Amino acid sequence: MTPYYEDSAVQIYHGDCREILPTIHADRMITDPVWPNADPRLAGSSDPAGLLRSALSVANCKTVVLQLGRCSDPRILAAVPDKWPFLCVSWLRYAVPSYRGRVLNDADVAYAFGDAVASAAGRRVVPGTCMSTRGEFLRGHGRNRTSQQFQETQDAMPHPAPRHLKHVRWLVQWFSDEGETVVDPFCGTGTTVLAAKGANRKAVGIEIEERYCELAARRLAQGVMF
């Protein structure tokens, strides 16, 4: 299959990850999957657990890291097969939080399954917290007082679920080793592959929506963070 975008470190494929994953090699998976109460604009939002279960059933990697928002329904984690035992949970905090109704949206959460990275000086134990001071896609105002205000700013974003590059860089650093290949089967606008490339990893991104493939390719080609 011909990549939608390719450079010396990254390949992006436009298509269904369930069809593409069996054809590629990757050491670690770091992704932000479609979750049960996801924005309906996201492909796969009608059956997120089924989508994740199907994708993981054809994946062959040592580690799976799933990043979820604080308001994302975590029951999707039941879709992770037993062949990847639970490893740890990490908190990806925001220095400037927002509000979603009654909930203070001050962190994402990452769940890791499978093998830890190789033990080395400075990497004997895996920490559990990362702090990010800003996002790469600016929302216009950081403190959304109501669910309606939150949704209005989300609707104006290039992607319904952007993640902070610093958070994903941290996940790449602590859940993969230099020189390995990281795959993101729900690539979106390419934050994971951008983070992996910057950390001397190879990366493969898979995205079913061509408009997001285009944005990811543009970010990589221009070397931009937004």
Language-model regions, residue ranges each:
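Conserved ATPase-coupling elements of RecA-like P-loop NTPase cores
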Residues: 37-44
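Short strand-turn motif at the edge of the Rossmann-like AdoMet-binding core
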Residues: 34, 68-71, 186
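Beta-strand-turn-beta hairpins that frame and shape the catalytic cleft
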Residues: 3-12
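Class I S-adenosyl-L-methionine
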Residues: 24-30, 40, 80-226
